Amino acid sequence: MEQLLGIKLGCLFALLALTLGCGLTPICFKWFQIDAARGHHRLVLRLLGCISAGVFLGAGFMHMTAEALEEIESQIQKFMVQNRSASERNSSGDADSAHMEYPYGELIISLGFFFVFFLESLALQCCPGAAGGSTVQDEEWGGAHIFELHSHGHLPSPSKGPLRALVLLLSLSFHSVFEGLAVGLQPTVAATVQLCLAVLAHKGLVVFGVGMRLVHLGTSSRWAVFSILLLALMSPLGLAVGLAVTGGDSEGGRGLAQAVLEGVAAGTFLYVTFLEILPRELASPEAPLAKWSCVAAGFAFMAFIALWA
């Protein structure tokens, strides 16, 4: 028991150190600032951004969405079994079967997607004056020739970037808490180490991508560091909670509530991935095949890690 506790505490500090190191690297080194980059340097940063976009895409589909769907289905099955009497089993078995076949997980993830869509639309409706955007972003996104040459259609307004960055941080924070919670609840040393290594493998790349995203959005260094620090604390927080509640009772809908929150977080993450990250990285027309290769490489790496996650 003491060995298991020591391993989990080691995982806690490893998660904290890796997240801080990977997240702060793009913020602390000026080489990653795309605004001042020119020529080959700028293209390399663009391709790194495409790799991070592929990592986000893989994390959204292969980890967050997959885990949310599995957990929601499992918790709904438990919830329905616990709240069904013997008489109801005999009289409404067909109805229960129909309820079990309904895609609850997909619905919850979609609700998370539309919830953020609504919040963003509401913010833009209430603050129409914010549509101006920053000078740097206007230079990067402006220029009618980009819209004419590129086939991806109209790009999102640059003023939405900070809001979507906030949504990205919140969704990743939720997911990080649940990842840490899962590590903290593991019953054996082998299971704890295996899950922690899987989390470390994909979390490092994801947080590095978050750091790059904050830098490219022109976030001040102070707020960027503060954001990474908060994100870094989420997995250790979840792990600490897992240690505190090990052996506790998961009845009373607590597991279902956790699964629903994870589904909503997955939906918000997909929203930001498809409407902010991918369009921004694919906006400029240079090296389209190289960009595709980088996005595919990032996704493939996350799909490979999903074998052990």
Curated annotation (Swiss-Prot):
**Where expressed (tissues)?**
Expressed only in prostate and uterine epithelial cells.
**Intervals, Extracellular compartment:** 1-8, 68-103, 186-189, 246-258
GO-annotated biological processes: cadmium ion transmembrane transport; keratinocyte differentiation; zinc ion transmembrane transport; zinc ion transport
Keyword Ion transport among record annotations: yes
Question: Site annotated as Critical for the pH sensitivity: where?
Answer: 63
Quote the annotated effect of residue 269 to A. Answer: Exhibits a broader substrate selectivity
- Any known activators or inhibitors? Activity is increased at acidic pH (6.5). Inhibited in the presence of high extracellular K(+).
Annotated Pfam families: Zip (PF02535)
Task: Give the consequence of mutating residue 276 to A.
Answer: Abolishes transport activity
Q: Where in the cell is it found?
A: Cell membrane
Taxonomic lineage of the native organism: Eukaryota, Metazoa, Chordata, Craniata, Vertebrata
Q: How does it sit in the membrane?
A: Multi-pass membrane protein
Which of the residues are on side Cytoplasmic? Answer: 30-46, 125-164, 211-224, 280-288
Q: Which reaction does it catalyse?
A: Zn(2+)(in) = Zn(2+)(out); Cd(2+)(in) = Cd(2+)(out)
Q: What is this protein called?
A: Zinc transporter ZIP2
Consequence the record notes for mutating residue 269 to L: Exhibits a broader substrate selectivity
The induction comment states: Shows a dramatic induction in normal epithelial cells contact inhibition.
Q: What happens on changing residue 276 to Q?
A: Does not affect transport activity. Reduces affinity for H(+)
Please give the function described in this protein's UniProt entry: Transporter for the divalent cation Zn(2+). Mediates the influx of Zn(2+) into cells from extracellular space. The Zn(2+) uniporter activity is independent of H(+)-driving force, but is modulated by extracellular pH and membrane potential. Also transports other divalent cations Zn(2+), Cd2(+), Cu2(+), Co2(+) in the order of decreasing affinity, respectively. In the skin, aids in the differentiation of keratinocytes in the epidermis.
